Swiss-Prot record:
Superkingdom to which the source organism belongs: Eukaryota
Protein name as catalogued: Unknown endosperm protein C
Species of the source: Hordeum vulgare
Miscellaneous notes: On the 2D-gel the determined pI of this unknown protein is: 8.5-9.0, its MW is: 11.9 kDa.
C-alpha cells in the first residue's frame, strides 16, 4: 500500500 524502501508496493 505504499513505497517504503525495503518493499515497493505502488
Amino acid at each position: 500500500g505504499g513505497c517504503d524502501g525495503d518493499r515497493q508496493d505502488m
